[in-house]
Amino acid sequence: MGKACWPKDRQGRRLTWLGCLFVAVTAVVAVFAVIFRPASHTDASAPAQATHPAAERASPTRSASHPPVTWQVAGPFADLSVPLAGMPPVADPANIYADAGPDMLSPSVRGVPYRIYVPDSGGSTVTVIDPATYRVIGTYQSGLNPQHVVPGYDLRTLYVTNNQANSLTPINPRTGRPAGPNIGVDDPYNMYFTPDGRYAIVVAEARQNLDFRDPHTFALRHRIHVTCAGVDHIDFAATGAYLIATCEFAGRLVRVDLHTLSVAGYLNLPGAAPQDIKLDPAGRIFYVADKNHAGVWLINAATFKVTGFIPTGPDAHGLYPSRDARYLYVTNRGNGTITLISFATRKIVTTWRIPGGGSPDMGNLSPDGKVFWVSGRYDNVVYGISTANGHLLARIPVGPQPHGLCVWPQPGRYSLGHTGITR
């Protein structure tokens, strides 16, 4: 599709890709069928999940016409089990989030006021909330179509990704205000940081690029073009050796070798619209929210193959580990619910329902883990939810289409980006 007819807004891109999804998937499957290696969909450590249509289609015991498929691209690649040099050591191999427990604040963020920064993606502002009073205390200009508020690797600066303005707005969390002029970068839908802190990764969704940039100047250092539309969310292996990114409009995941900065393989999830992705505390399973199939895929971190599926709710979207790393919070944007999955059993523990409905999207926990703050994407509000019982504590009006809000400060030694994923 030529640049002249490519929609500038995310909704337009979504409609365009949905319109040609069937043709594109059919063509890709036909061309590459000879090199695909079907994945094994069983894992002795994972409980069976066959109660949902998506899980049934993925089961090898059924005649699925397009089962999940993993394939590699031309190498050679580094050994992905080798830790990334320069990454802070993992304190507890059984829990990669061990250094991000309740109130485990780094010296870099001690004394920083507790605030919620909300990008109003339907406009060009960031709304700032004082969670102690449930009140908006400031609204600041950012740039057109702000999508996420992203903490820097060193925890000292927040960055607003102004998607259609091709810029980042730096915010000083000690003052809660913009900290200088906008920084020009191409198509910043989302942003992450490599576990060694060497690069910022600007997720250029419309361009299908992962742009590796200097984490301070944001000068471009390396670019990876991925052959899947809608690349938008990322998480990293426990070793830091690779990342997995979701491609929403292509129904595909891509694995990138961080030793060599090259694509190491793809995983097809036919009919899926993968959203957020999160690694379990043990570093063994990536959970992938799937909007289309209303649930969460389980991907074996070592083999890059599907091991199960857990139905959660319509428009499954955001994924956040509890502060004690026992549960995964799944936001189901389509029916106003939040599902809790046990990391230990890989089964649903409970589901919380927002009174009167809602559209929970992206958010994060309070530093002590007692409140889950999440944007109401289509209701122009922010929800505060008690993690003790799921009760709604607050419903705070904000700007149009609030998206990837950032709760700050967060516990942890360093930030991997997004809305405040720390380890």
Residue ranges and their predicted role:
Residues 1-3:
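N-terminal intrinsically disordered, acidic low-complexity segments at the extreme N-terminus
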